[in-house]
Amino acid sequence: MHAASREALAKVSSDLDAALAADNTMAVAAQAGTELFDVVDILDGDRALRVAVADSSKDAHSRVGLIEAVFGGKVSPSVLEVLKDAAEQTWSTPREFRAGLVQLGRRALLRSAEKQGQLGQVEDELFRLSRILDRESKLTQLLSDRTQEIGGRRDLLAKVLYGKVTAVTEALALQAIGRPEHNPIDDIAALAGAVAELQGRSVAHVVTAVELNEGQQQALAEKLGRIYGRAMSIHSEVDTSLLGGMIIRVGDEVIDGSTSGKLERLRASFA
């Protein structure tokens, strides 16, 4: 996002948090997230409306009036206020206005998970889903096929997820499938990282030769926390080709302690 859009999103996000905190119920936050996603779908199907509600050449009053005319009575009063607040801001492009609404919808759903004490579970489910999609290339291809209707692709993923994840995880994942400018694997993995950030944690991506148990993950999180000076979430996966040890990535920094990596460095030293 450009600077103006980042500023607009920060303002509306703060207002959204305040509104959800004032109500303090999980159901209201979940409804807000769902309705914001519904609004995004409407904007996706109406380019003229998408451009008009974020047209910076028009005054804010006109944009807010358009929001009221289109969505008044169709969404809850609290979501209508969020939409009016968003329309009042200056966004760099209509695309970034739409992206901002996606972020707001996600934020509302995550606040509902927070009120239920499910943030950690949602984070883990999203990360696991991103790894499943990475392994199941046929499924990912079907979910990414833009020649097929979004509704059909979402129905397919809903069948895969049914009864296996929280309602918040399912809602977030289904919405991600409809984002044509994003790879669903990367988008869902980034969502898991956003959940960690909401909990005040940074993410350590860990690849190991054998699966880490819960105690080992906790010990690794504590050790990395001491190294980096902040709380850490461990997103781990198994790659038997490492032979042993692990590879850790935190941001742009990579620590290769795998057996295969050590052997490769040893071979290079004799070259």
Curated annotation (Swiss-Prot):
Keywords: ATP synthesis, Cell membrane, CF(1), Hydrogen ion transport, Ion transport, Membrane, Transport. One of its GO terms (molecular function) is proton-transporting ATP synthase activity, rotational mechanism. InterPro entries: ATPase_OSCP/d_CS (IPR020781), ATPase_OSCP/dsu (IPR000711). GO terms for cellular component: plasma membrane; proton-transporting ATP synthase complex. It is a peripheral membrane protein. It holds the Pfam family OSCP. It comes from the Bacteria. It is found in: Cell membrane. Disulfide bonds: none annotated. PROSITE patterns: ATPASE_DELTA. F(1)F(0) ATP synthase produces ATP from ADP in the presence of a proton or sodium gradient. F-type ATPases consist of two structural domains, F(1) containing the extramembraneous catalytic core and F(0) containing the membrane proton channel, linked together by a central stalk and a peripheral stalk. During catalysis, ATP synthesis in the catalytic domain of F(1) is coupled via a rotary mechanism of the central stalk subunits to proton translocation. F-type ATPases have 2 components, F(1) - the catalytic core - and F(0) - the membrane proton channel. F(1) has five subunits: alpha(3), beta(3), gamma(1), delta(1), epsilon(1). F(0) has three main subunits: a(1), b(2) and c(10-14). The alpha and beta chains form an alternating ring which encloses part of the gamma chain. F(1) is attached to F(0) by a central stalk formed by the gamma and epsilon chains, while a peripheral stalk is formed by the delta and b chains. Belongs to the ATPase delta chain family. PANTHER family: ATP SYNTHASE DELTA CHAIN. This is ATP synthase subunit delta. It comes from Corynebacterium glutamicum (strain ATCC 13032 / DSM 20300 / JCM 1318 / BCRC 11384 / CCUG 27702 / LMG 3730 / NBRC 12168 / NCIMB 10025 / NRRL B-2784 / 534). The gene is atpH.
